[in-house]
Amino acid sequence: MHFVKKNSEEKRKDLNDKLKSNKILRVPGAYNPLTAKVIEEIGYEAVYVSGGVMANDLGYPDIGLTTLKDVSYRSNQIARVTNLPTIVDVDTGFKSCEETIKTFEKCGIAAVHIEDQIEQKRCGHLDNKELISKEKMVDKIKNV
């Protein structure tokens, strides 16, 4: 049995300290709790939950079909089994960035990144992506 010793706040502080160190962080992706535990045992600095991998694991293409519930549930499963900070790709913020951030804070997530694409985003590797304006993205960030 794997017992986590660090709470969410400690994990967030760890990530903040690591980012301030200006060192390159090795942050491999985990698609389930077992993968996260392996990442920790190998000695990486954090765990990353990819939106594309999450979509594919659920049987969807990476075009914005996952829900806040889908991603937060799996991310919580991953974060609770490791002492490492977990960073999650929250696509375009699932309609309400403020609600998304609150949800992921409750899930024990250390950080998220939010896409700057229009709704019904597309995988970053695909053509024909449309970005929102710089002003809208700044507003998105300010609102959270």
Task: Label the model's feature ranges.
Residues 1-29, 33, 37-41, 143:
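N-terminal amphipathic alpha-helix/helix-capping segment at the start of soluble metabolic enzymes
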Residues 10-13, 60-88, 107, 125-144:
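Alpha-helix-loop-beta-strand connector modules within alpha/beta enzyme cores
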Residues 18-22, 56-61, 84:
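Glycine/charged-rich beta-loop-alpha catalytic/anionic-binding loops adjacent to active sites
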Residues 21-25, 43-45, 82-86, 109-110:
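Short, well-ordered coil/turn segments that N-cap beta-strands
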Residues 26-32, 47-49, 86-90, 112-114:
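Hydrophobic faces of well-ordered beta-strands that scaffold small-molecule active sites
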Residues 33-53, 108:
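Catalytic domains of carbohydrate-active enzymes, especially glycoside hydrolases
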Residues 35-38, 88, 94-106:
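Catalytic cores of alpha/beta
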Residues 47-70, 92-96, 114-135:
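Glycine-rich, proline-tolerant flexible connector loops at the mouths of alpha/beta enzymes
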